[in-house]
């Protein structure tokens, strides 16, 4: 009808931008049916009335079943321009259809460490676990994916990603020659300090705004704007470009960190390590250790605890871990955060590793893989259903699946799987008829796979016969032969007479 061809141009090719669904025509095409021998009467009628329009069949290119999308490209290849077209092809049309999909349960995703997995659930953002500052996490990975594969790289990437996002740098770590665990620990320490400084600056900003009465809370967009106004006021006479500060969040965070460290009695130049600082390689290790020590000291102070800074770094770490066990607050340098349940708002009983990781969507989408079959094509050799979605095939019920049914003791289900649902040709037809006519299903027969096995054995020169429960013998020759066993005593072979 007109609806089916409304998006086709004068050549019968679909236009770019058209929305298409299952069975939509992409390229209109008709093929004449084979000319049959005409009767004398038909020849007379054709001679009188002229050549009638011959019978044609519709052979249009259509969208496959279950597919949809928008046409993004159409290419037409002709023999004049493309001499490498197949023999007998004058014109070829290639239509590209694209579709946008959201991630859904069953889609496959993977990181860069072989940590692939399948999405098990997609939930509203308000139900996702969230950090203390209210930010929800994007994706939750099962921790069992780490000890089994022992790919610790994904944890280190998460830690370094968190530090890089907090401090505003880009990490480039070649395989086997990237950041060491000590360097990542130092960056996590600096990340905690800049985040803590930003939090403290926010508290001070609101106190200052409250005292000067220059702004009302309604005038400000959020905490971020309050911090920037406060920093611009405090740093106005220090030679810093206030205009640049207001437009550059990263610069503002770094200035807040420097201010906070000075207020706490530390020299920022001995702790921070931003890319533009160009710290010599020989001094980086000492700079990193100072950063870790300062972080642990400031973290302990924020919890009302004291650390002895004269201890070695290893002893300092152990003391910090003891504080963590007492208070339930994770040490900043281990890369874990306090998470809260999205539904209840309660803290989880253990700190959780949170960070930034590259995660990719693989080209194994559940929408392409979902498939169902009632009856369909069968293999000519085995008489079993074909395999795969493309052939409209069945699901393979393999050896291990058979073990599972055996373990459950599901004898009748297993018998069905191996006979009428598979390659018992007579049995599946009889079962179908019984279901349609609402009659009892008969006992299954012999699977075709057994007959194939018998033929293989016969090719080796081995004669095979089946003896049924009722004593009936089935021999497999050119035509399968059924007969009664007349002498069940076994004294004489009934085939050769008495």
Question: Which residue ranges define each predicted feature?
Answer:
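Long insertion/accessory domains within large nucleic-acid-processing enzymes
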Residues: 1-498
């Amino acid at each position: 009808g007109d609806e089916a061809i409304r998006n086709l141009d004068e050549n019968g090719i679909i236009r770019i931008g058209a929305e298409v669904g299952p069975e939509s025509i992409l390229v209109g095409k008709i093929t004449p049916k084979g000319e049959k021998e005409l009767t004398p009467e038909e020849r007379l009628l054709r001679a009188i009335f002229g050549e009638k329009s011959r019978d044609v069949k519709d052979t249009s290119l259509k969208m496959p079943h279950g597919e949809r999308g928008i046409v993004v490209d159409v290419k037409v290849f002709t023999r004049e321009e493309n001499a490498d077209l197949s023999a007998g092809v004058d014109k070829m049309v290639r239509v590209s259809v694209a579709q946008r999909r959201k991630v859904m349960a069953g889609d496959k995703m993977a990181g860069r460490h072989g940590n692939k997995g399948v999405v098990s659930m997609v939930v509203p953002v308000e139900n996702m676990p969230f950090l203390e500052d209210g930010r929800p996490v994007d994706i939750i990975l099962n921790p069992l994916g780490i000890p089994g594969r022992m790919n610790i790289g994904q944890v280190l990437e998460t830690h370094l990603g968190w530090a890089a996002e907090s401090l505003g740098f880009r990490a480039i770590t070649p395989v086997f020659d990237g950041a060491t665990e000590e360097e990542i620990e130092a960056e996590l320490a600096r990340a905690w300090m800049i985040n803590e400084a930003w939090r403290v600056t926010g508290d001070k900003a609101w106190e200052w705004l409250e005292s000067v009465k220059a702004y009302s809370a309604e005038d400000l967009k959020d905490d971020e704007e309050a911090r920037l106004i406060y920093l611009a006021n405090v740093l106005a006479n220090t030679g810093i470009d206030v205009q640049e500060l207001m437009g550059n969040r990263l610069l503002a965070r770094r200035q807040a960190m420097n201010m906070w460290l000075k207020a706490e009695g530390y020299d920022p130049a001995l702790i921070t390590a931003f890319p533009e600082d160009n710290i010599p390689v020989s001094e980086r290790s000492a700079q990193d250790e100072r950063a870790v020590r300062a972080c642990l000291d400031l973290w302990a102070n924020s919890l009302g605890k004291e650390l002895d800074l004269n201890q070695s770094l290893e002893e300092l770490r152990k003391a910090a871990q003891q504080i963590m066990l007492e208070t339930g607050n994770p040490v900043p340098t281990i890369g874990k955060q306090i998470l809260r349940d999205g539904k209840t708002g309660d803290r989880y009983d253990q700190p959780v590793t949170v960070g930034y990781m590259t995660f990719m969507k693989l080209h194994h989408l559940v929408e392409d893989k979902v498939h169902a079959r009632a009856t369909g094509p069968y293999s000519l050799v085995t008489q079993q259903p074909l395999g795969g979605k493309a052939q409209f095939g069945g699901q393979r019920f393999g050896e291990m699946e058979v073990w599972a049914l055996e373990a459950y003791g599901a004898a009748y289900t297993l018998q069905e799987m191996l006979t009428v649902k598979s390659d018992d040709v007579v049995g599946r037809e009889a079962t179908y008829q019984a279901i349609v006519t609402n009659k009892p299903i008969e006992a299954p027969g012999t699977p075709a796979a057994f007959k194939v096995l018998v033929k293989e054995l016969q090719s080796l020169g081995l004669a095979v016969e089946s003896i049924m429960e009722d004593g009936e013998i089935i021999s497999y020759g050119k035509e399968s032969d059924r007969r009664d066993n007349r002498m069940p005593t076994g004294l004489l072979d009934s085939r050769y007479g008495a």
